[in-house]
Amino acid sequence: MLFSDFCKILDKIEKTTKRLEKTDYFVELIDFIKTSEKPENLKQVSQITIGRVFAEFENKEIGIGPNLLLEAVKTTGIPEKDLKSKIKETGDIGTAVENLSSNIKQVSLFSQALTLEEVYSTLKKLSEIEGNSSQKKKTRIISNLLILADPVESRYISRLILEDMRIGMNIPTILASFSNYFNVNKESVEKIYAVTNDIGLLGEKLISGSDIENDPELKLKVFRPIKPMLAQLTPSIEDAMIETKMPQFETKYDGARVQVHKSNGDVKIYSRRLENITNSVPELVEEIKKLDIDNIILEGECVAMDLDSGKPRPFQDILRRFRRKYNIDKMAEKIALRIYFFDVLYYNRGLIDTPLKTRREILEKLFGTNNWDSELEKIKKEIFSSKMLFSSFKLNSGDPNLVKEFFNWSLSIGHEGIMIKNPDAPYTPGSRVKTMYKVKPTLENLDVVVTRAKIGMGKRKDWYGSYELSVKDNDGNLHVIGNVGSGLTEDDLEKLTKIVNEIKIEDLGEEVILEPKIVLEVTYEEIQTSEKYEMGYALRFPRVVQIREDKSINDINTLDDVKKIYEIERNRK
């Protein structure tokens, strides 16, 4: 498939704002591929359309930032001054390169047109280049690719290198297109994507005529992590109990979500972003290897513990462990980790369609019970033990007074609150469900992405000291909700400034526009209505709690979350 044919349809998709039209254009693209010589190209097309070369679970990136891309573009013959001016004018490096493509060095008239396979394989190679001269090699490869591209191709190649296509396409739209073209149930393709995290594989299977409902490659598999199921925020324990009828109560831990996979004695541990963190937590791996269980996927919360106080250490200590690459054993001696397991998703077969109560029974057979209402003394001893693997603390009673007592006890031992779960519910990967609720004592902190940064003043003049914060809507579009500068230490500012310089897209002098890659957890006094921002809401007195290196733009809060918190707080007043 010629890359130019692909880009023509991408251009159509980009020019419409209507979701149904985007779906129709992608259906047109599928039909074009279906009748081509290589229908398997749908795999690459599906991934590229959302700005990815690798499947999400592979945890790989092209690894090229805006600065390196700019260097590569300059070597094609485009003057740096013109390039920066055009980026400032258009707000997009892809459009800037397209508009200035007449400056790109010409190649032989007899050179062949770029194919989809060539572009795809070239970009995959970029992620594999390492070593002292890697920057030069990457620059040369990108430059050669742009020299071979026509103007529209150069727009999309530039964006794909930054993994941001800017055409308004997302996974749900591609899944809707699959459903329409292949005449398959939309819920089926959504569920299969949820257990594979591989839109390319799903497209490849559909176009080859596979029976996707029964294809073993499209089932939940060990060592292919899935996105976690997410809880709803609830205004009160009472409201959540009404929604979940005969609920199950568990402690909400102050830690980091992890997924543990084990098969044939091999163990891998993944973060909520599906990152493989196995090498960073060797002591946990060794403990899991000792268990007489195999062919299993477990989910739990990894907590950094202070064994003297029996309370969790700061969340940043967990991130220090997850990010550590050297002297891991020494760090393990300083920061003790444990996992509280609260779900089993696979045990010799997929379990996500079975009720939570059944999954919990399996979990308790493996790790024992931790029933707060009948085993509190045992739990108290375990809190101070050096044991690393537990089942989560659970309350079996629905007595409102006991539930409140359990909630307060969970807070007293340093955790965040409680979870309220429907015991009859299945596990729905990657979705925020109405069968699981979190109850916390204070306003819910928000995870937001930084979209702009501004140079600081006074003591902060050497760093970016103020950050524009955004949340996303259901289509993935970003909406500004405020600016923050408080809560950041000098170490934080230094770290953020370094990242900003690597991901800035446009320089406006004292302010820069960024790729949406920095996630901050912020607290605030309240959410208020505001005409200043398009979304109609703003954070009052936001303050940074921590830099969430364990989260990506996929994990940030949504506009709906903001509206819900606003309504909850308004009803409390």
Swiss-Prot record:
Taxonomic lineage from the root: Archaea, Methanobacteriati, Methanobacteriota, Methanomada group, Methanococci
Record-stated family: Belongs to the ATP-dependent DNA ligase family.
Gene for this chain: lig
Catalytic residues in the record: 252
SUPFAM superfamilies reported in the protein's UniProt record: ATP-dependent DNA ligase DNA-binding domain, DNA ligase/mRNA capping enzyme, catalytic domain, Nucleic acid-binding proteins
Keyword set, alphabetical order: ATP-binding, Cell cycle, Cell division, DNA damage, DNA recombination, DNA repair, DNA replication, Ligase, Magnesium, Metal-binding, Nucleotide-binding
EC number: 6.5.1.1
Gene3D superfamilies with a match to the protein in the record: DNA ligase, ATP-dependent, N-terminal domain, DNA ligase/mRNA capping enzyme, Nucleic acid-binding proteins
Cofactor: Mg(2+)
GO molecular-function term, one example from the UniProt record: DNA binding
Swiss-Prot/TrEMBL catalytic activity: ATP + (deoxyribonucleotide)n-3'-hydroxyl + 5'-phospho-(deoxyribonucleotide)m = (deoxyribonucleotide)n+m + AMP + diphosphate
Organism: Methanococcus maripaludis (strain DSM 14266 / JCM 13030 / NBRC 101832 / S2 / LL)
GO BP annotations, alphabetical order: cell division; DNA biosynthetic process; DNA recombination; DNA repair; lagging strand elongation
Protein name: DNA ligase
List of residues binding ATP: 250, 257, 272, 301, 342, 432, 438
Residues forming coiled coils: none
Record function comment: DNA ligase that seals nicks in double-stranded DNA during DNA replication, DNA recombination and DNA repair.
Keyword ATP-binding included in the entry's annotation: yes
Keyword Disulfide bond: no
NCBIfam families: dnl1
Pfam family, one: DNA_ligase_A_C
Top-level division of the source organism's lineage: Archaea
Disulfide-linked positions: none
